Amino acid sequence: MLLSKKSASFALSAFAMLFTSVALAKEAPQAHKAVELSILHINDHHSYLEPHETRINLNGQQTKVDIGGFSAVNAKLNKLRKKYKNPLVLHAGDAITGTLYFTLFGGSADAAVMNAGNFHYFTLGNHEFDAGNEGLLKLLEPLKIPVLSANVIPDKNSILYNKWKPYDIFTVDGEKIAIIGLDTVNKTVNSSSPGKDVKFYDEIATAQIMANALKQQGINKIILLSHAGSEKNIEIAQKVNDIDVIVTGDSHYLYGNDELRSLKLPVIYEYPLEFKNPNGDPVFVMEGWAYSAVVGDLGVKFSPEGIASITRKIPHVLMSSHKLQVKNAEGKWTELTGDERKKALDTLKSMKSISLDDHDAKTDMLISKYKSEKDRLAQEIVGVITGSAMPGGSANRIPNKAGSNPEGSIATRFIAETMYNELKTVDLTIQNAGGVRADILPGNVTFNDAYTFLPFGNTLYTYKMEGSLVKQVLEDAMQFALVDGSTGAFPYGAGIRYEANETPNAEGKRLVSVEVLNKQTQQWEPIDDNKRYLVGTNAYVAGGKDGYKTFGKLFNDPKYEGVDTYLPDAESFIKFMKKHPHFEAYTSSNVKFNASTDALPKK
């Protein structure tokens, strides 16, 4: 429940009074001393317990490698724990949602590997609430790690009451250090499923209230473990006094260095960023990418006055040497061998930020147990589709073309509907046909089928945009599908239907009409060029890929409030089938396309 500004202000005031008068008794001033801390951190592992593939530029060649995996995470944490003084091991939220390990085990697999990693603290992320309060409880009950979140407060009658604390205080070399937890508010309330008995409070106001109260306790060294996202936490760093270090999550940003840039990894910011708070004191902010790919390693020295300085800063990218693939002369991916392989490994071994072949035996055993069960359960039926086949795949991307289904890719409309169901507040969704790789046939649907239909691991993305821009998105996609690029760009949707001509008019436009479904009246209405709609799509086209140029222009413009929900499209498919266990197949794609008699466009 997100409170109105007036209600939130009153509630925060009451919360502040309660916190300062009861939770913390003011202490007399005391002498402080310098202390060093080793902050080791991850965030947003999203049930990625096994390694996954990425591409790097290695010695001038694009190279496929495997990165991440929780065995590597825990092995690296154990090594660094033994190596450095005063380790503090943190997880900045979003442990769950992203793979079948969550879909099938509801957080117990994630809790098991996190327990094996001996984290000191975990903060809640928005995805912790994806399965409601009951779903979060399935993660928290087996979790042996203290959970912190100051701005997420369950009512006393909630099943989540007393399951976490707003902050904790620990002692290092006789010096008290405080750590505060925060969650992202709008994303959790609007894109996840917290119960109405859970209240959410503004991130910045909560951070300042907590910092003030801890300062009154005589503590001058404060860490913020925050899933509020990089942008919000950067704002906190510059607006809130008395916080020294912010370990962030949610944005999935790789904070890196020149080593990682040389590999063409997607470094967003330097590790760590440094800002000044209103008092002029330094505040350090860092994030560790996502999907168990990075262990952040920050050495911090606090002066007696509580001023932080950095003694070490290494974002460790966890990588396997077992896969080093490049394209051969025929364009096929093949393993490097001989001198080329040795040269590649020598380059990686020379980099402080690359950690090769870390494995933890205990974690390997845990994952192996869950993997065997996952492979078995993945064949279980989640629902049944009745009626006709819903055509998809490359042969049916464009309606009414020679060789294709007259309706085009009904399967793509179906996927758009599963997104529409998941993103409960959107007005419409748009999906590219190339993202759906197969026909969806009548019969039983298993967990594995979802990942067969949607193999790219896309996440759901939203924009707030005018109707005129929605129409331009459709125009862009059709142009790319029919003329400029690939048929896979052809657009389908849910909550939206349109008619278009293959041959553009004198103004270069193909659209004849566009209608949006009014959720209140359940009536179709002409799209309003000036109205702002909340539009859902997948993160791939949201960034401008596949010819979706207008989406691409909105991507970095805050006016359009772009949000990557990090909800997996395959997970949305599974949830839809669970909600509709006997689903009658669609027979329409919601697209009327007046095709010409020209030859098929190029694939």
Swiss-Prot record:
Superkingdom in the source lineage: Bacteria
Cofactor note: Binds 2 Zn(2+) ions per subunit.
Predominant cellular place of this UniProt entry's protein: periplasm
Binding positions for Zn(2+) 1 per the UniProt entry: D44, H46, D94
Cited Gene3D superfamilies: 3.60.21.10, 5'-Nucleotidase, C-terminal domain
Residues annotated for substrate binding in this entry: R397, R437, F456, Y540, V541, A542, G543, G544, K545, D546
SUPFAM superfamilies hit by this protein: 5'-nucleotidase (syn. UDP-sugar hydrolase), C-terminal domain (SSF55816), Metallo-dependent phosphatases (SSF56300)
UniProt keyword Transmembrane, yes or no: no
Protein name per UniProt: NAD 5'-nucleotidase
Native source organism of the sequence: Haemophilus influenzae (strain ATCC 51907 / DSM 11121 / KW20 / Rd)
